[in-house]
């Protein structure tokens, strides 16, 4: 991934996630119990990965910013006929940590 693609990719993923997680639902789609936590985990790992990989933004701002975005989504979901869940935010934060870790690992492998 080229360094100049991290910000546009992150913006695109952020917008997509925000719309998807705030879109009003009549009822949750049928899915196995807890599968939404996996979706949160993967989504926020995907969001943090490109920023950690390129290293243009410090890791602490990536962690705080992406985790705060997940928390903000959970706080405003009730305004969109969605339910807030602290466990969703925990899955977001774990995803951020793993996304950062994968980005750092890939950066290290690419340097060899």
PLM ranges: what are they?
Residues 1-89, 93-112:
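Bulky hydrophobic segments
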């Amino acid at each position: 991934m080229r360094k100049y693609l991290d910000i546009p990719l992150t913006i695109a993923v952020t917008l997509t996630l925000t719309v998807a997680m705030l879109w009003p639902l009549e009822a949750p789609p049928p899915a196995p119990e807890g599968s939404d936590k996996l979706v949160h985990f993967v989504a926020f790992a995907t969001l943090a990965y490109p920023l950690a990989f390129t290293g243009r933004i410090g890791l602490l701002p990536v962690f705080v910013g992406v985790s705060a975005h997940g928390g903000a989504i959970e706080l405003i979901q009730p305004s969109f006929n969605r339910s807030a869940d602290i466990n969703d935010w925990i899955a977001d934060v774990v995803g951020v940590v793993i996304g950062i870790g994968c980005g750092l690992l890939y950066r290290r492998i690419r340097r060899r």
